[in-house]
Amino acid sequence: MWVNPEEVLLANALWITERANPYFILQRRKGHGGDGGGGGGLAGLLVGTLDVVLDSSARVAPYRILYQTPDSLVYWTIACGGSRKEVTEHWEWLEQNLLQTLSIFENENDVTTFVRGKIQGIIAEYNKINDVKEDEDTEKFKEAIVKFHRLFGMPEEEKLVNYYSCSYWKGRVPRQGWMYLSINHLCFSSFLMGREAKLVIRWVDITQLEKNATLLLPDMIKVSTRSSEHFFSVFLNINETFKLMEQLANIAMRQLLDNEGFEQDRSLPKLKKKSPKKVSALKRDLDARAKSERYRALFRLPKDEKLDGHTDCTLWTPFNKMHILGQMFVSTNYICFTSKEENLCSLIIPLREVTIVEKADSCSVLPSPLSISTRNRMTFLFANLKDRDFLVQRISDFLQQTTSRIYSDKEFSGSCNSSDDEVYSRPSSLVSSSPQRSTSSDADGERPFNLNGNSVPTATQTLMTMYRRRSPEEFNPKLAKEFLKEQAWKIHFAEYGQGICMYRTEKTRELVLKGIPESMRGELWLLLSGAINEKATHPGYYEGLVEKSMGKYNLATEEIERDLHRSLPEHPAFQNEMGIAALRRVLTAYAFRNPNIGYCQAMNIVTSVLLLYAKEEEAFWLLVALCERMLPDYYNTRVVGALVDQGVFEELARDYVPQLYDCMQDLGVISTISLSWFLTLFLSVMPFESAVVVVDCFFYEGIKVIFQLALAVLDANVDKLLNCKDDGEAMTVLGRYLDSVTNKDSTLPPIPHLHSLLSDDVGPYPAVDIFRLIGTSYEKFGTIRADLIEQMRFKQRLKVIQTLEDTTKRNVVRTIVTETSFTIDELEELYALFKAEHLTSCYWGGSSNALDRHDPSLPYLEQYRIDFEQFKGMFVLLFPWACGTHSDVLASRLFQLLDENGDSLINFREFVSGLSAACHGDLTEKLKLLYKMHVLPEPSCDQDEPDSAFEATQYFFEDITPECTHVVGLDSRGKQSADDGFVTVSLKQDRGKRANSQENRNYLKLWTAENKSKSKTAKDLPKLNQGQFIELCKTMYNMFSEDPNEQELYHATAAVTSLLLEIGEVGKFFITQPAKEDAVPGPPCGQAIPGMLFPKKGSSQSYVVESTEPLTASLAVDSEEHSLGGQMEDIKLEDSSPRDNGACSSMLISDDDTKDDSSMSSYSVLSAGSHEEDKLHCEDIGEDTVLVRSSQGRATLPRSSSLDRDWAITFEQFLASLLTEPALVRYFDKPVCMMARVTSAKNIRMMGKPLTSASDYEISALSG
């Protein structure tokens, strides 16, 4: 390609000149190409090794063209190429278009200017024609991308993130090379002294990623997969490399978990022209994502908030009259601050609250100050800002966007929910739109919303307000303490501010740890969790969800209904319909908001507590914060998040209570207790009034406090747990301890915990104060940091998700192993290959949406599905019949056959059923599969139109022929009705019964798998018409095209084809014969025409295949130029017996009235062979045997333009005819080694794209 001219001082160093003229030189890199001239040898090896180690661009473009004037010592690179052909084209263009022109110039400087301008003009014109946009990647990185795609055969869709120099340890020998990190793969390439080694590992196959340090190798990264371990060392910046590897592995695990693909963020601001371009645009994107994730976690912001930038500054804090050093963070909707000293002060200022941003006057005490005022009359003063003008401009831009969004939201929502006070003051009305309650009113704690003209009942008061059970005389001391807590919080608000913009300090945490007053609990939960931000930015969202979900039912709503009455049944608020209805609405609304989660057990317990202290909409947004931000992946079908934190808890227990760890591991208690403790935040194992204090701390500190509390519980029971003999005893000890945790400050009447009611305590357990327990947890385990937990979570997430994937694989294999002929090992390999193809299509694209192909709610066997494009690739590599140009057509037919439900996707069970029949089925099963693939109608067929192939035969065989209405096609399924994909077989007794076909279809949908399997016997298979028979012949000829016994198989196929043509012709005679019975009487039913069923004594038959040209040429199938019929016209059948002019020689299909009308008789079809010793004797023929005879003349396959609509054959005839040819029998009986095919499929790359990779693989051996 043409490149911008660059100066080269040493033109011949490490390069060999191949062609030259007065102005241009074509050179080749030493070590590339072995056609003499010093290309090989030791010098070439050294140069090649040097290029790899130094990452030279000559590794990508080993050819180049230089420009030089005769009297100058400076050379200019003007073109380069990866192949000799590419660079030769550029050379010839220069000779034809520039060489003559340059001789006209007299000044060498003019020549140089002209050449440089010409080359730059060519590049600009190319970019304009091809619409090449400005790329932020450096030229060096672009070369690395080209090298990456060429070295590892990756498609263009595979994006390189970064590459690093390192050493890979193969045994005890390090191989110096380059590690390439792409979105989906970790790759390594090394070229030393002529030996090249490559390694490719998919991120989804990694089970462990560790940064280790040993005495010999202080910095080393260990990458583990299911089958091997890999070690990399000698990094220039190991921390940066490892962080990027962690991030890419996390993206891969997210893809396994919920099928989320990676999409590059195109909205990142471009770098300034003056800033150096050191990293790729994709690396910048990933770095920005990591920073945004930390930013959101630190300040509890919504999931879609993106960090724009951060800067060091100071904040003036009026409560202690100090300037606190810290960092300011600016994003699209928020300005946040956190101090350098942990927990000293933090601040969150939503831009929706900001009224004024102005630059204050600078002074020696306050250099570069910035003042920000909010609606609640708070002013924040920042100083020591490095680039204040730029910062003010960015904040102003974001403020304009925020203001426009606020106005548009107001216009959308109107006045129906402009403020809570307005809504509360509205008169109540009867509401009858709820499916659970017909009426409700404000007096009962519910209010009507007028959204789009519909009324949606939503509770306006907390359930605790309506169902408070306390007696002032009985609880006076506790009420006094509660009052003091409220006053302490009010004083705190007056000093530090109230609402989202308040200063959050160590004092705030102290008040939370002492317990939040009941009257303030809902407000502070919203504030501390960040749910108040989502509620404020989504007005009317919850009411819309409630309205949308009303009256709709699915699996989630069924599970919700089942668990409603199990949610705090001991509390009076959930002993009546009002509390139950509010809980139902919140859970159902969230299930519709997040269908990936829907509903998970334990959500009902947590939500019921939220409803006690927060209004209904507030409880919904608290649930959103809990499920999507604070406890990620906890509440899904596989509770992955809880399992990850269970692993983290085990590690923490090993570090902090080592004396107990081994004992707990032996008893298996940690895994049992952690799920129930973490999923419900101790609400299900601790008395209610104590558990809500844990929830208070959780909303302030996050998951950190749950780990601390769990460790404190174990630490308090060390001695008793060490004396336990089994897990039941240990669980009893912990259960009794948690039941004894009390809250002496609670103003609620004691609510007996359900666990304590059911347990048989031998005696009272000493009471444990919840505040003392929490204090102890901070004293002993307060050093646990949130960033440490995140690191441990990553390590456990890899292990947990891969363990779940292995469990899923075992469950699938165990379920399906009895249905197929594959071994367990073969099924496991096939499943890994099938899933890998599904995942590959997710990130490299496919013809269907990846989310449609993966549904975690389905059974394991149906979770991963592939479309036709993916199936076609696997068909070519795994199926024994894939051969030649006909493979795509055959794959399409098999895909239609396997796609039983007609959704254009097949799951693993369907895939394996077809593969098992084709590879390990007996001869009859294989031929039945081949027959069924061709009896399917064409994709363009219309469902309501009768199949033309059987139109005539069905009329006369209504009493015995099953009717097949299975019409499927890749292109036409979208237009078909809901009955698509069901095979409907109805044994017709009368033509008038066609009207009942719909009832039959509905009935057959209810058939069990056993009944379906019975209906697919050979007798029930539809007949093959002439067009389908032609396609079957084409398939068979293509199947044999690469077989060693190709000629023998062609001869055998020709004989079988001729035989079946004759059978079809005679079958047509006996089909049309009954229609003429009135005019021409036929023979009695029980009699056969003499000489037709049995040959005359002494007569013999033989089929002789003659051809005027070699059989290979005459029988070759070329669908583009000729039809199959024209190619088979030279197939002749000769009969040595006298010809009977009165009847057509054929196979007799005896439709005796004495046979059962509902089934077809089985016939053994026999044919005399071409050898004398194969003659049949009368005593060898059974009662139901039909002898095949042929007529004189030629039997040819008709052309498609003149198909005979009455011609048809059955599967029994096809099977029996093929059995007459030993060559065909041997071919279909030939065993197939599936493991060998799977192994080759792992490494084969098709069209520059790896089909699949079930695990890590080496492209070339690293042992060299």
From Swiss-Prot:
Transmembrane segments: none annotated. Pfam families: GRAM, RabGAP-TBC. Residues 886-921 form the EF-hand domain. GO terms for molecular function: calcium ion binding; GTPase activator activity. The keyword Repeat applies. Residues 425-441 have a biased composition (Low complexity). Residues 1119-1138 have a biased composition (Basic and acidic residues). The record marks 601 as: Glutamine finger. Residues 410-456, 1119-1162 are annotated as: Disordered. The record marks 562 as: Arginine finger. Keywords: GTPase activation, Repeat. Residues 515-702 form the Rab-GAP TBC domain. Residues 146-213, 293-361 form the GRAM domain. Disulfide bonds: none annotated. CDD domains: PH-GRAM1_TCB1D9_TCB1D9B, PH-GRAM2_TCB1D9_TCB1D9B. It comes from the Eukaryota. The arginine and glutamine fingers are critical for the GTPase-activating mechanism, they pull out Rab's 'switch 2' glutamine and insert in Rab's active site. May act as a GTPase-activating protein for Rab family protein(s). This is TBC1 domain family member 9. The gene is Tbc1d9.
